């Protein structure tokens, strides 16, 4: 470095401030570095001033500030403390100013006014040295003590700091630590900061005033933020030189300043041109409490931690805090779908299954089985069955479960096949009587009515029975010995018994008109098929003279016998006929 007496950053702890440069010179001579490296680390005064790598004037200015202006003495101002009165909201800043509360409340988003007005900054952040605004009085030591002891004044000072951070596109993340991050509108504000270089002087004043008025812990986070935005993110190229010459050395804490210089040396390109610290000491330096960047406003954790600065270079919303690890959210909501995979839940589930196995419904049992299987599932694996599928399976199980208590009463069973045959015989006879008019029943119709029901009409053999309109359907083809009535064995109607068939094949089964005894009229009450239906008589009295074929009385299988009629009447009374 060109003048070691102007930088006490790397002096030994036991040395005095006036002997700062001797340690650097001695150490550099003792080290075995090459001559080229030594020349790069300590360029000549002429080279520094010509190339601008290290500003000698900035070194003197910051050294003077860090040592509390040893050449200054407080002037007698007759007890006037203008800076304190301004912060107590008693006077307006000069010239043509306003009260501090008016500035803090109404100037917050008025970026044009904050940019164009050059008189308020000396009042908001006073220093012990005079500035360009001669109306602003230098800060006195009495005022410094009053600033530190007044809670109201310190609160307004923090609000003024937040006002200027917002103007530059920053956000104060934590008032306690001074952590800084990007604001939501940082892009246009960064553009304004790159376009107006006079803001670099304002930032230097802000850093100095924070150190004077008791907010030294705000210095290092802000400087770290600028170093990262200039050297790592390259978003503020116009601020880079001021950050290295002024901002970096405004930090009064020597240890924090060393950490910041080391961070700047790590990210400076090309490193051989870095002249803001001795290279040999930077190589041996081990950072311990480098301020850590934050992720952004509203997205930072408040726990302390340590991270490697090189790993944080690529993060987007950068902030600076002192030894803070705010890389993520403090809490993460657990996935509701994984709540059932905990071991404690699994043990409770097994106990409930053993205790309540008998009282569970099929739906609940299926749900618990699926939950048990889900416990064995890999956390990263997708659930094979969703909630909707589980509900469907449970509903299907409920429908298939046979429980006499929970099931509703079923509909009435279909009538017996024998009763259905008798009912069909009655209906066919009524239709035939109305259609022919003479009451003659053909042999084929008699045969069809006497045939047993087909398997399609039996509900035990087949569910969907045919309607009574099919006159050719046979009932009981599989059982040739189906009985019409269990009491009368002679009433069996089957295909195996040729005598039971009534058709043209058996001439004896046909009864002609020559046999008057074959007439079945109302005089014989036993010949009625059903007592409820008087129209079910086979032949009326007016048809006695007609030549209608009547069954031979010798045939023991005719349905008009007394036993058969009684049996049919009994069956019909027990079973309701279906609606037509």
Curated annotation (Swiss-Prot):
One GO cellular component this record assigns the protein to is: perinuclear region of cytoplasm
- Stretches with biased composition (Polar residues): 489-538
**GO function terms (MF aspect):** opioid growth factor receptor activity
Region described as Disordered: spans on this chain: 1-44, 285-390, 405-580
> Which keywords belong to this entry?
Acetylation, Cytoplasm, Growth regulation, Nucleus, Phosphoprotein, Receptor, Repeat
Sites where N-acetylmethionine occurs are at 1
Q: Where are the sequence repeats?
A: 467-475, 476-484, 485-493, 494-502, 503-511, 512-520, 521-529, 530-538
Region described as 8 X approximate tandem repeats: spans on this chain = 467-538
Q: In what ranges is there compositional bias, type Basic and acidic residues?
A: 300-310, 352-374
The UniProt entry, under Pfam families, shows:
OGFr_N
Q: Which pairs of positions does the record mark as disulfide bonds?
A: none
Acidic residues bias (residue ranges)? 1-38
Q: Where is this motif: Bipartite nuclear localization signal?
A: 257-286
Concerning its family, UniProt says: Belongs to the opioid growth factor receptor family.
Role description: Receptor for opioid growth factor (OGF), also known as Met-enkephalin. Seems to be involved in growth regulation.
Q: What name is this protein filed under?
A: Opioid growth factor receptor
List the source organism: Rattus norvegicus
